Amino acid sequence: MNLMKKYLHSKWTSIEKLNGWRHYEVRNVFINNKELEIFSICDKKNTFRVKITDINDNSKWLPGWEEIV
């Protein structure tokens, strides 16, 4: 499957708050490095890279925007 299509603009919820936020969207896919550039929906300046293996780890990330209480 084309990684660009699978991950680009996908939405994710972080189990733990990162820089104060949980809800992120994929802005860029770096296929060679197997990394995603994600940004916080509430603070678009809050961006960083995440390994694709980490984003698929359900103990760290959930697909979509989920409410975590």
Segments the model singles out, each with a brief description of its role:
Residues 15-25:
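Short coil-to-beta-strand transition motifs
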